[in-house]
């Protein structure tokens, strides 16, 4: 099943392949490829091959100075964009791919895609963003410390928030608009969000996409969902919408 991909990469093939397109997954910040097991199983059921790998999203994996050798920028966002691009290069057997990215790491995937559209204009046919990215990165950095990392001390959260945010990117996601301007006209994108998301507000996600008329984007709004729990807790809403979107990509 697996070739020798770096970063524990796995190419997981559908039992009955019905599409030539590969679903390329990028997990959420400081997550793990195993967290996407349900997503991979579902797209396999639909007849799509899937690819997953582990991000190098800990500062120590970059000697505490994450840096992009492509964009020449410091910050975890830009370093992860390089890693994502490297894995895309390893999958040249698949001429067409669909990007499926989670939370604010979807912004890293957008950075990679904006670069690649120049030389690989037909490679990435569509994008799915689950629970992100958000336009207000300082806010989501604060909520990351509170909700995901469980930091209870208010003074410590206030001190740590700018460290986390600027360690991600000094652009603080203002560069997402420049990335999206590079996307092709009428580019298909599905934005999945939970109305009860405590980390990235749906309105902050809308702020990313609404200015861009070249993006043909659709929303899947889950009124009872929080951050990243749509497929796990609300499969009856999540699965049909995802299947319909994928099947619309010809």
Each PLM stretch: what is its role?
Residues 2-64:
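Short, surface-exposed "cap/lid" segments of acyl-processing enzymes
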Residues 92-103:
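Alpha/beta-hydrolase fold nucleophile elbow
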Residues 28-29, 131-133, 195-196:
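Residue-level signal for short, function-critical loop segments
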Residues 122-167:
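Hydrolase active-site cap/lid region
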Residues 161-243:
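Serine-hydrolase catalytic core
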Residues 57-91:
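Catalytic nucleophile-loop/oxyanion-hole region of alpha/beta-hydrolase
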Residues 25-26, 130, 222:
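Alpha/beta-hydrolase
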Residues 108-118, 127:
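Short glycine-enriched nucleophile-adjacent loop
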